[in-house]
């Protein structure tokens, strides 16, 4: 199984990552900033070169005519490129850990300011991994905005609120698929069963006692520092 812990910065998703890593059958690697975004952009650029660009800008010049700026784009095998990208990601990014069930922490898919791009990136992940488990995590915008990464950013409350609501709406609408979990930091940080029970239900052999210890550490990067 493949999974991703999808959230936004300073929601406690590193605690979820550590909780998952107490199990003996699931492993979660840390975030790789913008990797999924750039992989998606690569594939989307090839699709655009093959379809929308010729149709909108050069409708009268065939793609097998070298007067066309996207000459021979129609011969690009998109499915093969996707398969190569997927294989490279599995082997060289996820493959750094040895586990039958591997996932990653993802904080860089943002509905702010463009929800359509975020939805497309989620769809891209589901293209790579059709049965992927999305573990979604949210946190109260006011509390989240006090942490160091947010408090000096303009419009941080609006961005956090937007991203939080996008996750909730996506969970309800099904863009993350039927196989997803919605967690709320403001609940599970006070009651660890709100974190433990959904992970166990997903098949993770986690150590509940260790998770209690991890949560109680109060990681500094999600505090008010």
PLM regions and their residue ranges:
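PAPS-dependent sulfotransferase catalytic domain
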Residues: 95-206
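PAPS-dependent sulfotransferase catalytic core
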Residues: 1-88, 208-225
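Mid-core helix/loop region of P-loop NTP-binding domains shared across ATPases and GTPases
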Residues: 89-94
């Amino acid at each position: 199984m493949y999974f991703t812990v999808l959230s936004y910065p300073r929601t406690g998703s590193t605690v979820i990552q550590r909780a998952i890593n107490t199990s003996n059958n699931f492993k979660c690697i840390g975030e790789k900033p913008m990797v999924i975004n750039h992989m998606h952009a690569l594939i989307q650029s090839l699709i655009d070169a093959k379809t929308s660009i010729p149709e909108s800008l050069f409708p009268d010049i065939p793609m097998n005519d070298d007067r066309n700026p996207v000459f021979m784009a129609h011969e690009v095998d998109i499915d093969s490129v996707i398969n190569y990208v997927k294989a490279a990601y599995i082997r060289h990014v996820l493959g750094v850990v040895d586990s039958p069930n591997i996932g990653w922490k993802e904080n860089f898919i943002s509905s702010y300011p463009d929800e359509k791009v975020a939805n497309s990136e989620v769809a891209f992940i589901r293209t790579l991994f059709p049965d992927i488990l999305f573990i979604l995590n949210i946190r109260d915008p006011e509390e989240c905005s006090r942490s160091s990464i947010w408090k000096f950013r303009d419009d941080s409350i609006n961005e956090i609120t937007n991203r939080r609501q996008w996750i909730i709406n996506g969970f309800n609408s099904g863009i993350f698929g039927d196989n997803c979990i919605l967690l709320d930091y403001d609940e599970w940080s006070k009651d660890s069963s709100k974190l433990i029970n959904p992970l166990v239900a997903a098949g993770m052999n986690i150590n509940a006692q260790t998770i209690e210890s991890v949560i109680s550490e109060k990681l500094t990067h999600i505090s008010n520092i």
